[in-house]
């Protein structure tokens, strides 16, 4: 049985990946400050042996872990955010993970963050992080390691979930660290053919609350030009409007002949009718990146427009349908958007010599 631990544990994508691989493991430690994420975590995996809320005040377990997983908040580096980088207090949480690695000395660690990390401060932030972690980087020895270096053999690569069997275009950078006494001949997993399309993750029966009204649909399809408003919220500028995204020749009742034709930007159909625009499917049948808002990508079902359900968003993160939650839709969307695509993580773990 391997011993595991994680910071910024969220709703347990790390646990899901281990379960998917059939690995017998024991959670020594998990950590997350969000009370709703903690609730969902416990609901699915039970209460860990040690489950602190704050990485600043948690005690580092004395027993060395086999795998340590960390995924600091990505908003500081996200291309979709303000990108304050290490000027954002969330951008320096890496150093808490670095401290954990230096003191606990896990056999392996996996670090995940947004692709925007690579270009923060012209690449200096990412280089500094690698210098703090690695005595070798992607197989190349570091000539003069920093005094603070954790002395791991470090490998990094940007991986896209659509290359690992999941119909979502989600690029993330992964850093894998391997301790000196472990087998440090590592290579990232090879890409896979995508055999699943966005239509394959849709639920058969969806509550009416996820649809917007016929009146609003008619208004949206009539509206062209520069800007328009729903509930006094400006949605977009020069937004293309078509009905060809996820199409089906049915209304709510029928479920046959679903297919994906084109992609575009559409108004996001939040419960109140407010919100910006949502990306729909791409021509290759993948979804744009699931985000943390409660106005997820919308889709056409016959002449109806609806947003993706929380279950569909978790499916796009490769969580199984056995995964459960009892939080609000708003929190469920946030939890899915903050998580890691399970199969990508599973493929990385599968390359480790556990």
Model-predicted regions and their roles:
Residues 1-4:
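Extreme N-terminal starter segment of soluble prokaryotic enzymes
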Residues 27-32:
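Conserved SAM-binding motif I beta-strand of class I
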Residues 17-26, 44:
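A short, Lys/Arg-enriched amphipathic alpha-helix followed by its capping loop at the start of a domain
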Residues 35-39:
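Short alpha-helix immediately C-terminal to the canonical SAM-binding loop
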Residues 57-67, 74-282, 288-289, 305-306:
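Class I S-adenosyl-L-methionine
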């Amino acid at each position: 049985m391997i011993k595991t631990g994680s910071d910024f544990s969220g709703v347990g994508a790390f646990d899901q990946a281990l379960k998917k691989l059939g690995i017998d493991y024991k959670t020594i430690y998990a950590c997350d400050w969000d009370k709703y994420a903690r609730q969902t975590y416990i609901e699915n995996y039970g209460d860990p042996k040690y489950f602190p809320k704050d990485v600043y005040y948690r005690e580092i377990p004395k027993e060395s872990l086999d795998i340590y997983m960390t995924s600091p908040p990505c908003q500081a580096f996200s291309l979709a955010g303000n990108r304050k980088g290490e000027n954002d207090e969330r951008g320096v949480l890496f150093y808490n993970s670095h401290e954990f690695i230096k003191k606990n000395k896990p056999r392996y660690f996996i670090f995940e963050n947004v692709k925007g990390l690579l270009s923060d401060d012209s690449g200096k932030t990412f280089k500094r992080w690698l210098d703090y972690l690695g005595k070798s980087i992607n197989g190349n020895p570091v000539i003069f390691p920093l005094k603070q270096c954790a002395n791991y053999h470090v490998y990094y690569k940007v991986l896209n979930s659509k290359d690992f069997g999941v119909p979502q275009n989600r690029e993330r950078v992964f850093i894998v660290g391997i301790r000196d006494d472990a087998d440090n001949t590592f290579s990232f997993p090879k890409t896979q053919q995508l055999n699943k399309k966005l239509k394959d993750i849709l639920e058969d029966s969806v509550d009416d609350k996820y649809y917007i009204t016929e009146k609003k649909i008619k208004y949206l399809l009539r509206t062209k030009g520069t800007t328009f408003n729903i509930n006094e919220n400006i949605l977009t500028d020069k937004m293309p409007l078509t009905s060809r995204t996820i199409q089906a020749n049915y209304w709510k009742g029928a479920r046959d002949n679903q297919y994906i034709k084109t992609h575009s930007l559409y108004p996001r159909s939040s419960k109140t009718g407010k919100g910006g625009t949502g990306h729909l499917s791409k021509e290759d049948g993948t979804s744009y990146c699931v985000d943390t808002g409660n106005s997820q990508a919308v889709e056409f079902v016959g002449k109806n427009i609806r947003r993706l359900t929380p279950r569909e968003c978790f499916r796009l993160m490769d969580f199984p349908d056995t995964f459960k939650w009892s939080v609000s839709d708003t929190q469920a969307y946030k939890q899915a958007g903050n998580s890691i695509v399970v199969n990508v993580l599973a493929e990385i773990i599968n390359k480790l010599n556990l």
